[in-house]
Structure formats: C-alpha cells, structure tokens
Amino acid sequence: MVRSFNFLNFIFLVIIFGCGDSESESSNDIVIPEESDSTWNLIWNEEFSGQELDNSKWNILRWRPGWVNNELQAYTNRDTNLYFKDGCLVIRALVEPGYFDEDYLGNSYNSDYTSGRINTAGKFNKTYGRYDIRAKLPKGRGSWPAIWMLGENISTDGWPYCGEIDIMEHVGYEDDIIHGSIHTETFNHNLNTQKSGSK
C-alpha cells in the first residue's frame, strides 16, 4: 500500500532549525553542497528568509505538556520559542518555571518548559521525492530535536497505522549521533520492531 505523507509534517521538536545562539555551539558557517543531479524538479521549498512563518505552508502548534510522547514542555506560538534570526528559523526550548497558558482546545495548563513546534499538515503532502534539509542542532541532555513525516491519514487511522518516517532525531546526550526510523502498523516502537539506523 502506498501512503502519501504530510511532507514536513516535520515536527520540529525541540530547539533549533537553521541557526542557534548558544555560546557553546560550534561555528555558524553552513556549507551548502553543489547540486549534483539536475534530474529533480523543485516543487516546494522553504528558505525561512522572511520575518515570519508563511501561514500558507506552516501550522504553529499549541499543545499542553504530555500531549505528545509524554513530553514535559508545552508547545507555544510565542516569538520567544519560535522566531527568525540572521536569516534562519530558530525553534528554542526554554526553562520557564510556572509558565501558564491554554492549549488550542482552550484547556489551561502549567509547565516549567516551553518550546516551538510546526508542521505542514493539510498544506503539503507528497508520496515520492527527494527532501533536502539543512538544520543546526543543539547538544545537551534533555534536548530532542526531530524532523518527521507522518501519513496524511493520521487523523482518521491514527498512529502507527498512518506510517511515520523519522528523517532525523537527535537525543541530546548522544553528541554526534543522528537516528532515522520507519514506523508502520507492523514495525513500530510500541512493539519494539521499528526499523532504525544511526550515524
């Protein structure tokens, strides 16, 4: 069965896409490889070159703590967690003891941690293609930046039946390791049968 994915139902989970502003980070130089194959046709791109997210491409998610993966942080739509700096989109996690807000359903919550989360659900999907992504990741225990693709049928079939491709996940305490996984009805982390690789 072929599934169409919400490409860039990239769920950017914790800290940074593009650039960062931590003193402990390495060089801000980004090397852009030369295009080696001209047989591809560009059908969608996002350079994050403006001053705000393009609402025709992106959704900003507002979720209370625990909504996804039992995570401690709340996902906000505030410019302290999601902003542009030096031509890059920054998604930043913060420690904010006593933070109070409402989720997208209007339910109140408290959280000591906040972050940003965006996706393209309902705005872009593609079954096949090549996806080039450039991101700078944080290091540090507790961070978990990730870029995922989920099946566009997630709202009707649920996970893992919709399928998931983890393009990149970085567990903060594993300094130089990036993980990629595929989750399906048969192969998923609930059954401990997911298909994964690390580099």
Language model: regions and residue ranges:
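Sec-dependent signal peptide recognition
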Residues: 3-12
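C-terminal motif of bacterial Sec signal peptides marking the signal peptidase cleavage site
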Residues: 15-18
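GH16 jelly-roll
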Residues: 23-199
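Intrinsically disordered, low-complexity segments
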Residues: 2, 20-25
